[in-house]
Curated annotation (Swiss-Prot):
Protein name per UniProt: Ubiquitin-related modifier 1
SUPFAM superfamilies found in the cross-reference section: MoaD/ThiS
Record GO biological process: cell budding; cellular response to oxidative stress; invasive growth in response to glucose limitation; protein urmylation; tRNA wobble position uridine thiolation
GO molecular function annotation: protein homodimerization activity; protein tag activity; sulfur carrier activity
Bilayer-spanning residue ranges: none
Role of this protein: Acts as a sulfur carrier required for 2-thiolation of mcm(5)S(2)U at tRNA wobble positions of cytosolic tRNA(Lys), tRNA(Glu) and tRNA(Gln). Serves as sulfur donor in tRNA 2-thiolation reaction by being thiocarboxylated (-COSH) at its C-terminus by the MOCS3 homolog UBA4. The sulfur is then transferred to tRNA to form 2-thiolation of mcm(5)S(2)U. Prior mcm(5) tRNA modification by the elongator complex is required for 2-thiolation. Also acts as a ubiquitin-like protein (UBL) that is covalently conjugated via an isopeptide bond to lysine residues of target proteins such as AHP1.
GO cellular component, one term: cytosol
Lineage of producing organism: Eukaryota, Fungi, Dikarya, Ascomycota, Saccharomycotina
Compartments it resides in: Cytoplasm
InterPro entries, sorted: Beta-grasp_dom_sf (IPR012675), Mopterin_synth/thiamin_S_b (IPR016155), Urm1 (IPR015221)
Post-translational changes noted in the entry: C-terminal thiocarboxylation occurs in 2 steps, it is first acyl-adenylated (-COAMP) via the hesA/moeB/thiF part of UBA4, then thiocarboxylated (-COSH) via the rhodanese domain of UBA4.
Annotated crosslink Glycyl lysine isopeptide (Gly-Lys) (interchain with K-? in acceptor proteins) location: G101
């Protein structure tokens, strides 16, 4: 049992997922609820291609500073951050705000 969510990597962050920007991800759920914290763990296990790239995305068990996180086009800080309970069809957008130039 479980459900699907969409995960997007923008602003150059797609380099951690073999340059694939959009992913449909099945969230396994046997009982209870899944949160963004669970989603972050799932992303590190199933989307990030090279374990060396995990620190590009994660720092101190959460999304690293400099990455804007949107849940259904709303800043995740307004949605409860890691505690947000996932729902089928949710869209999670991770955008790097750190650019060279």
């Amino acid at each position: 049992m479980g459900f699907k969510v969409k995960v997007e990597f923008l602003g150059g962050l797609d380099v951690i997922s073999n340059k694939v920007r959009e992913h449909s991800l099945k969230v396994p759920l046997e009982e209870g609820e899944a949160t963004v914290k669970d989603l972050i763990e799932l992303i590190t296990k199933s989307i990030i291609a090279d374990p060396k790239d995990i620190p590009v995305f994660i720092e101190d068990d959460t999304v690293r500073p400099g990455i804007l996180v949107l849940i259904n086009d709303t800043d995740w800080e307004l949605e409860g951050m890691e505690e947000y309970v996932l729902e089928s069809g949710d869209v999670f957008t991770f955008t790097s705000t750190l650019h060279g130039g």
